[in-house]
Amino acid sequence: MPVISVFGIPVDFILFALTLLGVALFHHHTLRVALTGLAAIVAYKLAFTAFPTGPGIAGLAAHMQHEAVILSNLFLLLMGFALLSRHFEESKLPDIVPAYLPDDWKGGFALLVIVFVLSSFLDNIAAALIGGVMAREVFKGKVHIGYLAAIVAASNAGGSGSVVGDTTTTMMWIAGVSPLVVVEAYVAAAVALVICGIPAAMQQHKYSPIMKDAPAGIKVDWTRVAIVFGILIIAILSNVIANVSFPWILDKLPIIGLAVWAVLLATAALRRPDWSVMPETFKGTIFLLALVTCASLMPVERLPVASWQTALGLGFVSAVFDNIPLTALALKQGGYDWGFLAFAVGFGGSMIWFGSSAGVALATMYPEARSVGLWLRHGWHIAVAYVIGFFVMLAVIGWRPDAPL
């Protein structure tokens, strides 16, 4: 694929960097900026270079066909989990959570631990949204941006050591990486949770303390609770069964997304989903898909030589670059310690709000989180936690690379 460079930097990357800069500067117009950037990159490739699958319209069509399952699965999950989070909120179950959490900053930290655990077996989007709903209730609607960033970090950390907790770890599993290798990421993830979770919980306690007791007279809608758990169980089962018994179908159909929507529609007669959240969720979803598509169009055909330094750097890259193609390239190249890579590309995306699908989903629920400046300023502890967690894992386990797969 021909590449045109300016001072050694491919023009594709310059256009992508300008798009990300626009998202950071104009956080009230993120969708427009992302779509404009995507249009510019596509136009440039049509006119001057080529797509990863070839030149011209045919190359674009082939590329979009190649990305169709990933994009459609993200679309279905983001839209579906938004409805799930509303079912969860309207069930009133989050309203009784304060009765079971400590009354000071430790209550906020305990909530982050819950999100971490949920994400170990749920999709991190669902875990982040459930955490966002609970935070809204227990903090009386006032949630600090630093704490929102920590919710995203907790959801990404919890999924980093589980082959069913994150798309990237599932990719490793499909490629033949043992789940026992991936689970080592929890050494770094647990440390990172503590390092970022405690400061975030203290930020939140100072901003708006946790409710000391649950409001009186709360009546939980157990039918909605059952719907929520039904969706989550079916999503988990569809993921595991497809990966174990029918891995070929994962390249053909967005299995998990379809499973989520099948349960949502099947249970609509019992409790009507809150369709009113769809317009705003749709905007956030298209924004993420635009950035993911931009990233997939970049001329990244290889990574630096596999090493712990490269893995550490990929964590920072994943904050602005979709971690799915990064993981695919790493698997193709081989020579990584997959536990380190799982933590790096999983947790690293938490450093900026649009660095992970969980962050974009939560920012749809909390629009104030769409400011990169505020996210970096108040979520400073995430980058610190990433570096400390990585080096603790390096000291405890050591870099043990596998042979190419």
Language model segments and positions:
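Cytoplasmic-side transmembrane-helix entry/capping segments in multi-pass membrane proteins
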Residues: 31-40, 98-110, 143-153, 276-289, ...
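Membrane-interfacial loop-to-helix junctions in multi-pass transporters
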Residues: 8-13, 70-74, 100-113, 139-149, ...
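Interfacial loop-to-helix junctions that mark the boundaries of transmembrane helices
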Residues: 2-8, 25-30, 56-74, 178-188, ...
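Transmembrane helical segments that form the transport core of multi-pass membrane transport proteins
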Residues: 231-336
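Hydrophobic transmembrane alpha-helices that form the pore/transport pathway of multi-pass ion
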Residues: 106-160, 171-175, 328-343, 368-371, ...
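Short helix-coil transition sites and intra-membrane helix breaks within transmembrane domains
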Residues: 27-30, 84-92, 118-130, 158-166, ...
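Juxtamembrane and boundary regions of transmembrane helices in multi-pass small-molecule transporters
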Residues: 84, 90-93, 141-145, 149, ...
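Hydrophobic mid-bilayer segments of alpha-helices in multi-pass membrane transport proteins
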Residues: 10-20, 27-55, 71-83, 224-234, ...
